[in-house]
């Protein structure tokens, strides 16, 4: 198994625009960090954890091949804003999105053009083909050859 940390920065990335702190003013390349995301890969499976606004830039550095699933930890913009940029990966087939129900509902509200109601809207050309899958804490599920067990953690005061 290979885990690539695509981004380890804050919700604004590092450096933060307008910040004069030592880290943000640093010329050290280690102080230039994109927003949080990770790529988990085995010989046959590729999973993205969170898909923020830096997704496209992050993936330009990776081999272009199928993404078997995307795990979304929570609905914050810095974890979901790159979902529309999954479009090129849809040439391999629909992309499975895995999240808790509240996150799935937030995605439907924020990106209704990606998740049409069967009776009302239809996908128009160029929209990423995303399928929502609800996951539950402490219930193992499978993506490819990986078994995944979601756990609850604290994100400041919010449980995710």
Predicted feature residues:
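Binuclear metal-dependent hydrolase catalytic cores
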Residues: 1-160
């Amino acid at each position: 198994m290979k885990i690539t940390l695509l981004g380890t920065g804050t919700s604004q990335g590092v450096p933060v625009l307008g910040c004069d702190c030592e880290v943000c003013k640093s010329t050290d390349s280690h102080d230039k960090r994109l927003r949080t995301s990770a790529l988990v890969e085995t010989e046959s499976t590729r999973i993205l954890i969170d898909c923020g606004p830096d997704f496209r830039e992050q993936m330009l550095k990776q081999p272009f091949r199928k993404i078997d699933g995307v795990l979304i930890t929570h609905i914050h913009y810095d974890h979901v804003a790159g979902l529309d940029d999954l479009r090129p990966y849809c040439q391999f087939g629909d992309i499975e999105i895995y999240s808790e129900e509240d996150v799935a509902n937030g995605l439907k509200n924020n990106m209704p053009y990606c998740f049409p109601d069967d009776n009302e809207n239809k996908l128009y050309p160029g929209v990423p083909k995303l399928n929502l899958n609800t996951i539950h804490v402490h219930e193992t599920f499978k993506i490819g050859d990986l078994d995944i067990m979601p756990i609850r953690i604290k994100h400041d005061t919010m449980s995710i």
